[in-house]
Amino acid sequence: DFRDNTFDLVYSWGVIHHSPNTPEAVSEIFRILKPGGQAKIMIYHKWSIVGFMLWFRYGLLALNPRLSLADVYSQQLESPGTKAYSITEAHALFDDFSDVRITTLLTHADLLTSRAGQRHEGFLLTLARKIWPRRFLKFAFSRAGLFMLIDARKG
C-alpha cells in the first residue's frame, strides 16, 4: 500500500483492463497521485478494428451475431476477463481527474502487420493478412485502433 499523494507520475500500459475491477484501479491511481500529478494509461478501445475482426470470426461466422463486444474481448483477446472501453466510458472512468486527453492508436494487430494473434491462426487470418486494406483503414478508420491512450492530471 502506498500513501495518498505519493507519486508525480503513474504509468500503466495495458494492465488495468485486465484487473477484476478497473474502476477501482483507476481510483487507486487517483489516490496515490500527488495534486498536479499525471497518469499515462493505455487501455483497450472497444470500437477497434481488432474488436470487429474478433466479433466477425467468433460472433457472426460462428452463427452467434448477438455475441457482445464485451464477451468477445473477455473470451477471445488475451486473458479471460480482458475488458475494452469506449471513449465515453474511459472519460467516465477518469471523471475524478482534470485535463483528461484520450486518443486512439491503430496497432499492428488492427493492420494485421505482425504475427500477433497466433492463437487465432487459420485460413481466415492468413487470407486477411494478404488482402487487408491497410491504406484504406489508416485513412478511413484512424480512430478505430485497439490502443486507447489516456493522459490525465490530478487537479
Question: How would you name each of these model-derived features?
Answer:
Residues 23-38:
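A short glycine-rich, Lys/Arg-flanked "PGG" loop and its adjoining helix->strand segment in the class I
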Residues 8-21:
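A short SAM/SAH-binding and catalytic strip from SAM-dependent methyltransferases
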Residues 1, 47-52, 109-114:
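Short catalytic/ligand-binding loop motif for oxyanion handling, primarily in non-cytosolic enzymes
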Residues 1-9:
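A short acidic, Gly/Pro-enriched loop at the edge of an enzyme's catalytic core
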Residues 57-61, 67-72, 78-83, 87-92, ...:
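A C-terminal cap/extension of S-adenosyl-L-methionine-dependent methyltransferases
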Residues 20, 34, 95:
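Short conserved AdoMet
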Residues 38-67:
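Conserved class I S-adenosyl-L-methionine
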